[in-house]
C-alpha cells in the first residue's frame, strides 16, 4: 500500500503545529514516514504528552507517608495498613462520549479499570462525574441516556460496584459533555506492578483482545476542539466489551501471581504506540516491534492503523523469557490472545517492522521524555464584580427551584441503572454522600467521593480549586472516614487562550494549597483540554476524586436522621450567596465571587466531627444549596419532615464553606455543644427532624409534595 505524501494539510490533520513539525525534522534529520508522523502526532498531543499542563502539574503536592506511588504510573498507590494498598485514578472520556455517548462512556469505564488492574489490583469501586448541557437542548437527553446506559452496561457486566459520583447540567456543556470515570482497587502493598521495562532482549508480549480499526486517531481527536465536522469523528470512538475485560482482569491477576511479569502497561490512548514508548522510556530501553505478529480482527491493516488503534481490552507486557509457556497457557485458558510482538533493545530506538519493511525508526526518548513542553501565556482571572443585591425569597419556592432542577433533583434515575452491590461489600450506595466499601476480610472500609463546583472555578479559579478539594474532604469526613489522598481530572477549554490557561493555573494553585493543608496529596490524575465547540468553552471543571479510610465500620456515620433528632450546623454561617445554586436556579443569575475557603477551619471542623462521631446520628456537608437543600435531602431520604428555625435567604441558602449539618439525638445535644465550646468550633442549633411537613422559617409545605417533585424532576427533564 502506497503511503500518502506528507503535506502541510496532512500535518495539520494530525494536530501538529508547523513549528512542531520542524522540530520533528530536526530530531530525525529527514521527512517522517506516514506511520512515523502518526506516532509523533499521538505522542505529542495534549492527551498523551501534557505539553501545556506539565509545568503546572509539577507544582502539586504528591508525596506523603501514605503514598507508595504518585503520578507517573497508570494509577496512584496509597498505603492503607496491614500490608495492603488502594490503587486509584480518575480520567476523562469527554470527546468520545459526546460523539458516541454509549461507547464513549463505556470505554471510559473500561480504560480506567485497566489502569487499576494493570498495577495488580482487583477493582472494588467505581464512580463517575458527569456534566451535561441544558436539559432542553436538542442533544442533551440523547447524550445523558447514552452515557448513563454505557457506564451501567460496562461496569455492571464487568462486575464492579458504582458507589458514587455527580451529575450536573449547564449551558456551557451544550456542545461538549464531560464524562470523568474513577476506579479504585485493592492490592498487596509489596505486589504492585509497574510499567518500566528492564533487561535487554526481553520479549514484549501483546495480551487480550484483537486489534481493529476502532479508535484510530482517538488521542489526537481528544486533543482538539469540536466544530461542525464532529459527525466525521465517530469512527475514532472505540468499542468496548466488558466480558472480554473481565477475562483480561482474571488472566492478568493469575499471570501476576505466577512471577512472570517484568513490567506491564494497558493499551489506552494511542494504543500500542503509547504503551510501548512509555515502557521503554521509563526503563531507558528501546523497543522493537514486529507488527506481523499483532493479533488482528480486520484484514489488511496497515502499520499506521495497528500502531494507533485504540481497540479496547488490550495490554502490553515485558515477560520473563523462561515463563513464556506458563503465561501463554494462562491466556489461552481465558480465551485471550497471547503474542510475542517484539523485544527490548539497548539502543534508544523505537523500531517498527511490518512485512519486510521498516515502517518507523525513531529515537524513543524524543517521543516521550523530550516531547514539546509549553509555558503557555496566561492571564489571571479578574476579580468578580460585587454581587448585585438579592431580595428575600419565599424559602419554600427557593427549595422547590433547587429540588426541581435536574442538577439537584434525586438521581435515582441514574443510580438505578448502576449495580452498586456487586461483590457484596458496599456499605453505602450512591445518593447518600460518599460511597463506602468494605475492605474484604478485614474490619476496614474505604470511602470514595468526587467533587467540584464549576461556577466557583469560573468566578475565582483559586478559591474554586480549593473548594473542590475541601468539599471532597468534607464528604469523606461526613461518613466518618479519614481523608487519605486525591486524584484530579482537569477539564478545561483551549489552553492557547490566555484566559483559559489562567483558569487552569489558578485552579492548580488552589488545589495545591488545599491538598497540602488537608494532607490529601494528589497521587494520579488526567488533563483534558480543548473542551470547546465552535470556540465556546466549558466551565472550568477540575474534578477531584478522593479516598478516605475507616479503620472499622464502628467509625461509620450514618446518613439518615431519626424522628426527633436535633439539627445543628458545625461551622460559621455568614450567608454567602455569590455564585450560589439558589441564584442560578431561582433567579437565573451567576454573579458575585465564589465563597472563600478557610483551610484551617476546614481541617479543624473536620477533625472535630470525626472526634465526636459517636454523638451524631447522621451528618452531611453543606455545599450547593446551603442549609435548606442539605437539610431537606437528609430528612427526605429518611422519610421525615423538617423544621428549620433560622430565617432569611442568605442564612438558609448561603454556601459558606467548612460547614456540616448533623442530626443529634436530644440526649446528646448538650454533650456535642460542650465539645464544640471546648474545641473552639462554631455550633448552631438550627431546627429538628420529624413530622410530615417541611418548615423553613415561617413557611411550610407537605413533605409528600416536595418529595414527589424531588424524585420526579430528573426523569421529567430528561424524558
Curated annotation (Swiss-Prot):
This is Phosphoribosylformylglycinamidine synthase subunit PurL. Keywords: ATP-binding, Cytoplasm, Ligase, Magnesium, Metal-binding, Nucleotide-binding, Purine biosynthesis. Transmembrane segments: none annotated. It is found in: Cytoplasm. Substrate binds at residues 92-95, 114, 238, 310-312, 528. It comes from the Bacteria. Pathway: Purine metabolism; IMP biosynthesis via de novo pathway; 5-amino-1-(5-phospho-D-ribosyl)imidazole from N(2)-formyl-N(1)-(5-phospho-D-ribosyl)glycinamide: step 1/2. Signal peptide: none annotated. Mg(2+) 1 binds at residues 91, 526. Belongs to the FGAMS family. The active site is at 47, 93 (proton acceptor). The keyword Magnesium applies. GO terms for molecular function: ATP binding; magnesium ion binding; phosphoribosylformylglycinamidine synthase activity. It is an enzyme of class 6 (ligase). Its EC number is 6.3.5.3. It catalyses: N(2)-formyl-N(1)-(5-phospho-beta-D-ribosyl)glycinamide + L-glutamine + ATP + H2O = 2-formamido-N(1)-(5-O-phospho-beta-D-ribosyl)acetamidine + L-glutamate + ADP + phosphate + H(+). Mg(2+) 2 binds at residues 115, 266. The gene is purL. HAMAP family: PurL_2 (MF_00420). It comes from Cereibacter sphaeroides (strain ATCC 17025 / ATH 2.4.3) (Rhodobacter sphaeroides).
